[in-house]
Structures are given as C-alpha cells and as structure tokens.
From Swiss-Prot:
Pfam families xrefs: FTHFS
Catalytic activity: (6S)-5,6,7,8-tetrahydrofolate + formate + ATP = (6R)-10-formyltetrahydrofolate + ADP + phosphate
Biological classification of the source: Bacteria, Pseudomonadati, Thermodesulfobacteriota, Desulfobacteria, Desulfobacterales
Keyword Ligase in record: yes
Name of the protein in its database record: Formate--tetrahydrofolate ligase
C-alpha cells in the first residue's frame, strides 16, 4: 500500500512500513539463505557474503542495473529514491529484485542534505537505524582509521624521546624518522566539522604526544571506506590496509601501516564490517547497505561485495553511484567495474524538472532556503534550455556501451508539457525515457519506469572502459576531461606535473585506478557553472595517492575533505521520545 507522502514525513512512513517489515528469520526463508549465512543484529542482520557466494558460485548472475543522475542541484535529485522506486516497480511487476546502496554519513544526515534513505513511498527501512549508525560499520572504520593515527603519533613521540639504542632495547622498534611536514593521513569523525579542518596536536610535555599541525576529515572520505568499497574479501582488505601510506620519512620514502605494525589491528576492527547489512524498501524488497564513500572525493559506490551477493540472490540487482554521471557513473564504469570484473546491463539517468530548470538558467538553488517560483510553476523555456545537461550525460553513458534509460523523477509541481520536452530530448539522444511517480505512489507509480528498464536489460550491449590501464596517468585525465566533462584540455600545476611524472615512471603504480576529485555541482571544476559549459580547461593542482585502495586521485580545483555544517542544519528538527525511544524529524 502507498502512504500519503504529501501529508506524512519520511520518518512517519518508515514507522508505519516497519510494522510489517520482515524480520531476519523471515528474510532467511524469503531469500533462500542458509541459517549460518545470516548474522542477526536485532531486527537487522548482516549477511556472511563469503558463504553465500561460495554456495551460489555456479548460479548465473542477475541483471546488473546502475543508477546515476544529471548534474544535481545542492538538494540532490533523488537517486536513492529512484533506486528504491525501481526496486519497488520491478517488484510490482513480479520480478525477483533487490539492490545495494551506500550507508549515509552522519555529517549530511545532521546537516542539510538528510539521510539518503530515499523518500516518500520509496524509502529504505528501518529509517532510524539506517540514519543513525546502522550496524556500526562507520564506527568500525573510525576506530580503525584513528588507531592508525594513534600508532603514527605515538611512534613520532617515542622516536623523539629515545635514541636508537633505547628505542631498540625498550620497544624493539626501528626508527622510521617520519617527516611531520609530510603526514598524509589525518583523524576522522563522522560529522561536517569545519572547525577541525586545521588543528594543532601534541601540546603539553614530552609525554603528551608530538606537537605538529594536523587535520580531521569526514569518516566517509577515509581511505578505509574506499578500501571497503573495492575489497574482495577479508584477506584483500587486510593487505590493502597494510599498504596505506600514512606519511613520508625525511628521505621521502613512504611510511605505511605495515611499517607502523598497526595494519592487522586496524583490519581486526573491520572483521564484521566486511559483511553487508540487509535492509528493506517500504514495499519489502531486499536491499543491501554496504560502504559509503563520497563520490566527489572518493569512489562513491556501494561495495563490490554487496553487488556480488545481490547478483546471486535476485534476478535484477540495482546499485547507485554517487552524484552525477560525470563523477559517479564514470567511477562505476572505469574503476568499480574494472576492479570487480562485473558488466552492467543498464544505466538509469535520474533527471528532475527542477535540476533541468537550473541548468537552463533558473535562479540559484540554495539548500535550506525556499525555491523560487520558477521551479514550482511551469516554465518551458528553462526546461528546453536545461535538457542539454541531460543530453550530455546520455552521451557519457553511451560511450561505455551501456543502454541508458532516463527516469524523470516527477514532482507533483511538474507539468505534462515540461515532462514531454524531457522525453523528446532523451529519445532524440538515443535513450529510453520514462516518468516515474515512485515518491508519491511507490511501485505502482514506477511501472512505466520498470518496464523501460526490463526492456533495456534484454538488449545486448558493448560495455568497455574509456581507457586501458596501460595509458599514462596524464593521458587518462585528458581523456576523462575531454570526453566526460567536455573540457578543451587539462592544465597541470608544476607540483602536479612533477608528481604525475614520478607516478608514470614508477611501475608499482601502473595498475592504480584514476579517481578524479572534482565538484559535483558542475561538469567543470567551478560549481557556479551550470548546463554544459564550453571553452574551458580543467586545472589539476595535485595528485593524491591512495596506496591501499590503489587509487591515484588528480584534484581539480579545491575540494575539502571535511565539509562544513550550514546555518540551518537538520539536527535542529530531530528529536527522541523519552517514553518510547522513537526518533522523529529524520528526512
């Protein structure tokens, strides 16, 4: 049954839907799981992925469906809602369907954007658990990451306080001689805390640590989160963690978690994190939640492990990429699928009339502020101009060889004439297009959308990567900039050029993925520029090295690894009932 999403808040819909949500033992029977494959945690459960994959190794994979979007407004365009709506629509068509989504960060949940639990009748439940820590994965990652920082700062203190002979006699450790000006790692916390971007630590005496500048980043930007998204099993996870570069010594040599003898203990914190959590749509389709890296500063995907499990357990598996096709889909295409060896059947491009109007020259959209009337009343001229961004993204998807399906995530203020413009432009660009009212009506509102995806899945495709791994780093970046972003070329800073030359000449980085770091609010590096800008070049100021995740991250423009909390954050409206413990105000 569909709830009245125009009168009920998301948390209220979740509360009602949870009354009939399958419990772990019911999911076990429904999904055909063995008892030992389900690790119950209250009314949620984790799945022992290795046991499931081994048991179902000979079973053919289901259809692999990715969901992306056009360049969004700061409000987001409903990719999670669309992903869940598609699961519900396919379920309403009688299909065996499930999906995989990322775990939300506490930062955006308590800030402006909200939980990423979907919305209306296309919602992930139970919403409170999803929004407030779930089964502890992000907490495990914070503990593991910060243990690495504890190991490094303690080592620096002891090496300062003891000479070589004392260090060997008292601790059995060799001197690492870490350069305090070349520490790559910082501390992490799962909030948007701009006051922690630049800090000084170790104030006090010789037993109070090592005095130096330091920093905090948001937890989901941690390399450990990126590793969780791409790891294949616990052994792979442990190896990658040990390879993380935490700093450089005074001779310029990398210092890793293995050098600090802390990598194995960090992996121990994540022994259960490796298993995905099973949740439910509001219409009771299964959905795995696993990993939660940001897309503009990391890989922006749910885990490879979750996709491998889902493709074995159901016939249609839906997964979401962060932000727009230029960022999230590009990383799904050239990084996630390259690492996993999985080939998708369809990519869904989520579009809203609101975002298209913004790209057509509409007034500025500001999170937390009321929308201008241009976005809530018919304006065909803005839509007509704005569809160029959608057409560009369709072209990006088609370069991969995947069949694109445009989903018009329809709001109740959109008009038929506006939607007709979008459909005409999408079909002219070679994509199927369907409108969907899943927010309002759940699966019944997504039938046209589900049918388009089913049809697209039955067609063959010629999926291939944008570039071979043999291509040099700077050539890869140039290809991404020109063919995905629409740039005229790339301008490298002297520092970035020197680092790129070093990386290109060192064979150990030859198989590292290229992970672009760029704003999600524009095809360019400048978040102000909307639509499909022409006559611009992409500046690369630095290249970050994630030696554990095996990413090389060229940075376009300035991106902070620690977002800030805005002036009207969501936490002001979140409350808990002392009598029942029920949480209200989440969205």
């Amino acid at each position: 049954m569909a709830y009245d999403a125009t009168k009920m808040a998301d948390w209220q819909i979740s509360e009602e839907a949870e009354k009939n949500m399958p419990m772990p033992e019911e999911w076990c029977e429904k999904l055909g799981l063995e008892k030992e494959e389900m690790l119950a945690m209250g009314r949620l459960s984790k799945l022992d992925f290795l046991k499931i994959i081994k048991r179902l190794e000979a079973k053919p994979d289901g259809k692999y469906i990715e969901v992306t979007a056009i360049t969004p407004t700061p409000l987001g365009e409903g990719k999670s809602t669309t992903s869940l709506g598609l699961m519900e629509g396919l379920g309403a068509r009688g299909k065996s369907v499930g999906g995989a989504l990322r775990q939300p960060s506490g930062g955006p949940t308590m800030n402006v954007k909200g939980t990423a639990a979907g919305g209306g009748n296309s919602l992930l439940i139970p919403m409170t658990e999803f929004s407030l820590g779930l089964t502890g994965d992000i907490n495990d990652i914070m503990n593991a990451h910060n243990l690495g920082m504890v190991a490094m700062t303690a080592r620096m203190q002891h090496e300062r306080n003891y000479n070589d002979e004392q260090l060997q006699r008292l601790t059995g450790m060799r001197r690492l001689d870490i350069d305090p000006t070349r520490v790559e790692m910082g501390w992490i916390i799962d909030f948007c805390a701009q006051a922690l971007r630049n800090i000084v630590i170790g104030l006090g005496g010789r037993t109070d640590g090592y005095t130096m500048q330091s920093k905090f980043g948001i937890a989901v930007g941690s390399e450990l989160m990126a590793i969780l998204a791409v790891a294949t099993d616990l052994a792979d996870l442990k190896e990658r963690i040990n390879n993380i570069t935490v700093a450089f010594d005074k001779s310029g040599k990398p210092v890793t978690c293995r050098d600090l003898e802390v990598g194995n203990a960090m992996a121990a914190f994540m022994r259960n994190t490796i298993n995905p959590t099973l949740m439910s749509t509001a219409e009771y389709q299964p959905c795995l939640v696993h990993a939660g890296p940001f897309a503009n500063i990391a890989v922006g995907q749910s885990s490879i492990i979750a996709d491998r499990v889902g493709l074995k357990l159901w016939d249609y598996h839906v997964t979401e990429s962060g932000f727009a096709a230029d960022i999230g889909f590009e990383k799904f295409w050239n990084v996630k699928c390259r690492f996993s060896g999985l080939k998708p059947h369809v990519s869904v491009l989520t579009a809203t009339i609101r975002a298209l109007k913004m790209h057509g020259g509409g007034p500025k959209v500001v999170a937390g502020k009321a929308l201008d009337d241009a976005y809530t009343k018919e304006n065909l001229a803005l839509v007509e101009k704005g569809v160029e961004n959608m057409v560009h993204m369709i072209g990006v998807i088609r370069k991969s060889g995947i069949n694109p399906v445009v989903c018009v995530n329809r709001f109740y203020t959109d008009t038929d004439a506006e939607v007709a413009i979008v459909k005409k432009a999408a079909e002219a660009a070679g994509a199927r297009c369907a409108e969907s009212k899943h927010w309002e009506k759940g699966g019944e509102g997504a039938l046209e959308f589900a049918d388009a995806v089913i049809d697209a899945c039955e067609e063959g495709n010629d999926f291939d990567f944008l570039y071979p791994l043999e291509m040099k780093l700077r050539d890869r970046v140039d290809k991404i900039a020109r063919e995905v972003y629409g740039a005229d070329g790339v301008d490298w800073s002297p520092e970035a050029t020197a680092k790129a030359e070093m990386l290109e000449n060192d064979p150990k980085y030859a198989d590292f993925a290229t992970m672009m770091v760029k704003t999600h609010l524009s095809l360019t590096h400048d978040p102000v520029k909307k639509g499909v800008p022409k006559g611009w070049r992409l500046p690369i100021r630095d290249v970050l090295i994630y030696s554990g995740a095996k990413f090389l991250c060229p940075c376009a423009g300035t991106i902070s690894l620690m977002p800030g909390t805005g002036s009207n954050p969501a936490f002001r409206r979140i409350d808990v009932d002392p009598a029942t413990g029920k949480v209200s105000g989440l969205f």
